[in-house]
Swiss-Prot record:
SUPFAM superfamilies: Ribosomal protein S19. This is Small ribosomal subunit protein uS19. GO terms for molecular function: rRNA binding; structural constituent of ribosome. InterPro entries: Ribosomal_uS19 (IPR002222), Ribosomal_uS19_bac-type (IPR005732), Ribosomal_uS19_CS (IPR020934), Ribosomal_uS19_SF (IPR023575). PROSITE patterns: RIBOSOMAL_S19. Belongs to the universal ribosomal protein uS19 family. The gene is rpsS. Residues 77-98 are annotated as: Disordered. GO terms for cellular component: cytoplasm; small ribosomal subunit.
Length: 98
């Protein structure tokens, strides 16, 4: 369920302040953040934000298409290693018996 429109988007105050400060100075550094729930505002476009996924910080370059989404959507927290495929690794299934 989306957030109410009368409340407005949730943007981490410290993160927004750092981005606005970098915009005024014209810098482009990687910003580390643990705030996955923060919404991406148009001020973030062009910056690289390292979003924590529970283990490491994943660098996310913010483009125009990402505005309105949350930072956590672009830093997956789970790694998929595939299903147990013992037969597939050995070269196929066992031959059928008649």
């Amino acid at each position: 369920m989306p957030r109410s429109l009368k409340k407005g988007p949730y943007i981490d105050i410290k993160l927004e302040r750092r981005v606005l400060d970098m915009n005024s100075r014209g810098e482009k550094k990687v910003l580390k953040t643990w705030c996955r729930s923060s919404m991406i505002s148009p001020d973030f476009v062009g910056h690289t934000i390292a979003v924590h996924n529970g283990k490491t910080h994943v660098p996310v370059y913010v483009s125009d298409n990402m505005v309105g989404h949350k930072l956590g959507e672009f830093a997956p927290t789970r790694t998929y290693r595939g299903h147990a495929g013992g037969k597939a690794e050995k070269g196929g299934a066992a031959p059928k018996r008649k």
